[in-house]
Amino acid sequence: MYTEINEMLTPKVLKVQAESPYKARIVLEPLERGFGHTLGNALRRILLSSMPGSAITEASIDGVLHEYSTIEGVQEDVVDLLLNLKSVAIKLTVGNEAQVTLNKEGPCQVTAGDIQLTHGQEIINPELVIANLNEKGKLNMTLKVERGIGFHNTDAFVRYHEDEIEKKTVGKLKIDNSFSPVKKVAYFVDSARVENRTDLDKLTIELETNGTIDAEEAIRISASILQRQLHAFVDMKFEESRADNKERNDFDPVLLRSVDDLELTVRSANCLKAENIHYIGDLVQRTESELLKTPNLGKKSLTEIKDVLASRSLSLGMKLENWPPASLGE
């Protein structure tokens, strides 16, 4: 079985074609037929739903008690402000959580670059517009930034942290947000050729990130996630094989061999097989009297068997505990 697996093609060519700082096309070939869709779909799902990243998950705004409020002098209502905050691409380089602030007075346009960072944060899209203030406008916010995986769902947070929610300060607005740094993913499968084989696949993945990581790193991380999830299956087989080997090592290797290896006469060999004696370990546990009860096996055949066993330092009537091993015959 493993010989056939080793003979399967593995991709030899990996091309990364950068179309912009945050957008790239990755080409992988050649792949065995069907593996283009198998790998492409798996990587696409991971890239969209299971990538680690950072996002703003909570906002406290002076004078605001709930998300359906409005702020004097601010063109956007609170719902729009929260939507704009969701689009801020922020990178945490230190720790898993941080607090940043934003304090501005109008008239002005407030952008992501106005967020006051502490140590270990970086805004990737500082030009993003968050709000527009007139001469009466004033915006003071404290923002919570967290690292996570996939999608941050406020409803789920409330369900699992009801006690904490009851104790929280009024005015802290939870934000549904995606931690994934990947914005768009698409994959295509085309035909590939290697020598005379024309039934192979070429996988092309197009992806765009928010800039907190580049496209090549995103592919590398997603492949590592997939590899780690599948590793349990590899370990399972490895542990099973190791257990089988340990069980087999409890017995002399000679006992695990077929009685055919004893090179008995045809008559003696046929008599043993008729009694379901297939391995030398089966044979040595039989006594002389038991063998003599075997049809067509006489004293001459018995003597032959005893002599052959003796030449291998074995004898009839041996006691073997835990025989046969469960893996015998596999």
UniProtKB/Swiss-Prot annotation:
CDD domains noted in UniProt: RNAP_alpha_NTD
GO terms (BP aspect): DNA-templated transcription
Gene Ontology molecular function: DNA binding; DNA-directed RNA polymerase activity; protein dimerization activity
GO terms for cellular component: cytoplasm; DNA-directed RNA polymerase complex
EC numbers on record: 2.7.7.6
Region of interest (Alpha C-terminal domain (alpha-CTD)), residue spans: 251-330
Region (Alpha N-terminal domain (alpha-NTD)) residue spans: 1-237
Signal sequence region: none
The record's note on its domains: The N-terminal domain is essential for RNAP assembly and basal transcription, whereas the C-terminal domain is involved in interaction with transcriptional regulators and with upstream promoter elements.
Protein task: DNA-dependent RNA polymerase catalyzes the transcription of DNA into RNA using the four ribonucleoside triphosphates as substrates.
Oligomeric form and interacting partners: Homodimer. The RNAP catalytic core consists of 2 alpha, 1 beta, 1 beta' and 1 omega subunit. When a sigma factor is associated with the core the holoenzyme is formed, which can initiate transcription.
NCBIfam families found in the cross-reference section: PRK05182.1-2 (NF003513), PRK05182.2-5 (NF003519), rpoA (TIGR02027)
Name the record gives this protein: DNA-directed RNA polymerase subunit alpha
